[in-house]
Design a protein with these regions (language model features):
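Residue-level detector of intrinsically disordered, flexible termini
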Residues: 1-7, 44, 279
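Ala/Thr-enriched low-complexity intrinsically disordered regions
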Residues: 2-8, 21, 35
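Intrinsically disordered, low-complexity arginine-rich tails of RNA-binding/processing proteins
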Residues: 6-14, 668
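N-terminal intrinsically disordered, low-complexity tails
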Residues: 12-23
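Non-catalytic helical/linker scaffolds that mediate oligomerization, partner binding
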Residues: 36-677
């Protein structure tokens, strides 16, 4: 077993002392209440004059240093007021998280005000502008305050409470919490890599081994897919790979949660289409290749086929090379295909004209008997053809009906003049949707591809006007996501299906990822069920993927601190739809800041190196996005054909970025461009 890598702080501060034991606070008394009120009144006056933006700047009537000292004293007093409000104690935060909880509350108190002018004033004096206070908020503020006292010629000093992290201790706490949740960091990087498993990982040991050897630190299993047998096989392959590679890897299992989706759609016609291949000028470059197989015992084609047509075995067995099959297709067009190959009980046919083949279509077989002549041999019919999956075409201004009834959806119906008879309709997976939405609220479908406004709501039906769709319309399919960011749905984040799989998760996983968390009650509900199952030590990652979850993040963190191994995932897919794409960058920054203040590790997820994982080639923008993952403690990759390559490249990107960046801090290592200048 390879020795664990030294922590970032160990490498940087090996000689530093460990966390001190608690001692009596040495906080110097703050200004009298009257003085604090004076500063507060001045701040409120400035806030009113600036349209609600509070500025902590020196005024012309006061010496700048005195004003800055007063502003910092006010911020410090507000931190203590919020700490004393009982918020931390009522959430029963674990002892190991008490200092982090206080630091989080201090950070929230700091960020309740607009301190941009104060930052500018401090920077003009060559002091810290409080822009990197997250790990140790009160200590940062107190240090700046003491420097200001000295600059003002005062002998007064202020000390931070011993109940909050001092300089260096915040980073230590975050690193310790990350190690507890995700395991020790690999030797060359401190950011872990989480990888979503495809079903293939249950049967392909080499895939799991290669992922582990290339840098996977955490295996992610999505409980919305497959089942316990498949999940067990994935974990067995991982444990075997750990022994072979001498590496350790955590297992995280995602609970599916109450995902709001569209229902089924009535199937389309049982018809299939094939066509020959043509060049840019429309000339045929190769005929369509059709695989003819038995309708009762079909076999998969050994080569790519343009169409697969089932035929009854007796008729199929009598087909020979060069036989020609004549038929009238679904459009009434006369068509034919010729037998070009025999593969066991199956046949290969070729055709040079496009055709639409339907179930029960008559095939007349003719065989060459002499030059230019063919004799009738037999008639047979096309066997069962699977109906086409149907979608709903939605254009700007169209109406869509969302129904409580789970009857299959259907497209809109129009008369010969294209006048609407009945609008398109489709069911919704969760009945709570109809009790929680209101007219006038926005709705997004299919990961934000289609936007609309809810116009009317009845107990069994919601009428939506489509307000966003590309020219030519969008296709809405079955099982597509629905987001209602401004609605308040009464949903439990733990579904009945989640509770069924939770015992397996407790027994086999290291971490449970909790989907669609919205409130403190959701967190407490999961913790309660884990305790009943003997899973109190199981790591918990809350997935922030709704606007409500984001708005409640501080309280979610305090509730989460009842558990020891904890983390947050930025699920950027749903979150972008819920909060708006234009706000995603801002929202993910806020999550990173707040979690750093709470010393809680963050998983950076959704569409990281997506093009690389699926197509083998990354886009320029997603490489930059992956590099941003350096600011989190873990980066998650989704499954794809080239996931092993994606893991290797992501690991390389993170290793290269580590000397340049640590959270919000730019690290000034020796710069190549400066050396070659």
């Amino acid at each position: 077993m390879a020795p664990p890598a030294k922590s970032a702080n160990q490498r940087r501060e090996e000689s530093k002392r460990s966390l001190p034991t608690r001692r009596k606070s040495r906080i110097v008394p703050f200004p009298q209440k009257e003085t604090i009120l004076t500063h507060r009144e001045e701040l409120d006056a400035v806030s009113h004059s600036r349209g609600g933006k509070v500025s902590l700047s020196p005024s012309a009537s006061q010496p700048p240093l005195e004003k800055l000292i007063g502003s910092l004293n006010l911020l410090l007093s507000e931190m203590l007021e919020l700490e004393a409000s009982g918020l931390i104690h009522t959430t029963q935060v674990q002892l190991s998280h008490q200092a982090s909880a206080r630091n989080l509350v201090d950070y929230l108190a700091l960020r309740r005000r607009d301190i941009r002018q104060l930052q500018s004033d401090l920077a003009s004096l060559g002091l810290s502008s409080l822009g990197r206070t997250e790990p140790h908020v009160q200590s940062s503020l107190v240090t700046v305050l003491n420097v200001l006292h000295k600059l003002a010629g005062s002998t007064a000093t202020v000390s931070a409470s011993t109940a909050v992290p001092q300089f260096g201790q915040g980073a230590d706490l975050l690193e310790k919490n990350t190690n507890i949740l995700l395991g020790d960091a690999p030797a060359n990087r401190h950011v872990r890599i989480m990888v979503t498993m495809p079903a293939e990982a249950a049967t392909n040991y080499e895939l799991v081994r290669d992922l582990l050897s290339q840098g996977m630190d955490c295996m992610r299993i999505n409980c919305a897919h497959d089942g316990p047998e498949t999940w067990s096989a994935m974990i067995r392959n991982l444990r075997r790979a750990e022994k072979e590679t001498n590496k350790r890897c955590k297992v995280a299992m995602d609970l599916a949660g109450p995902k709001l989706r569209t229902g089924s759609i009535e199937p389309g016609p049982a018809v299939l289409k094939y066509r020959p291949h043509r060049d840019a000028f429309g000339h045929i470059t190769s005929p369509a290749r059709i695989w003819l197989t038995s309708d009762s015992d079909p076999e998969v084609a050994s080569e790519p086929a343009d169409a697969v047509i089932p035929i009854p075995s007796p008729g199929l067995g009598r087909l020979r090379l060069r036989d020609r099959l004549h038929f009238t297709d679904a459009r009434g067009a006369p068509r034919s295909m010729i037998i070009k190959g025999v593969k066991g009980k199956n046949r290969w046919a070729e055709a040079v004209r496009t055709a639409y083949v339907f179930e029960g279509m008559m095939l007349e077989v003719r065989r060459p008997v002499s030059k230019g002549k063919r004799a009738y041999i037999q008639r047979t019919r096309v066997g069962p053809i699977s109906p086409r999956k149907q979608t709903l075409r939605l254009n700007l201004g169209d109406t869509l009906l969302l129904t409580r009834s789970l009857d299959p959806g259907r497209p809109s119906q129009r008369d010969s003049q294209e006048n609407l008879i009945t609008p398109a309709q489709i069911s919704v997976s969760l009945p709570e949707f109809f009790d929680g939405v209101k007219a006038g609220e926005p709705i997004w479908l299919d990961d934000g591809m289609i936007g609309g406004i809810i116009r009317t709501v009845t107990p069994d039906q919601v009428r939506v006007e489509i307000t966003q769709a590309r020219p030519g319309g969008e296709k809405l399919g079955a099982e597509k996501g629905i987001n209602v960011p401004e609605s308040h749905l009464r949903l439990s984040s733990l579904t009945g299906q989640d509770l069924k799989v939770l015992p397996f998760v407790v027994k086999n996983a290291d971490i449970v990822s909790y989907s669609f968390v919205r409130t403190e009650a959701d967190v407490l509900d999961l913790q309660s069920h884990l305790a009943k199952l003997g899973g109190k030590k199981l790591g918990i990652i809350l997935k922030i993927e709704t606007r409500e979850g984001f708005d409640h993040l501080p309280r979610l963190l305090l509730a989460l601190m009842r558990s020891r191994a904890i983390g947050i995932m930025i699920a950027r897919g749903d979150l972008a739809v819920e909060c708006g794409y234009q706000r995603l960058a801002e929202v993910q920054e806020e999550i990173l800041w707040v979690c750093e203040a709470a010393h809680v590790p963050v998983v950076w997820a959704t569409q990281v190196l997506e093009s690389l994982a699926k197509n083998g080639i990354p886009s320029r923008s997603e490489v930059t996005d992956a590099a941003m993952g350096e600011r989190a403690e873990c980066v998650m990759l989704n499954k794809g054909r080239y996931t092993v390559t994606a893991v290797r490249i992501l690991s390389d990107i993170l290793e290269r970025m580590q000397p340049h960046h640590e959270k919000k801090n730019s690290l000034l290592r020796k710069l190549h461009l400066a050396v070659v200048f």
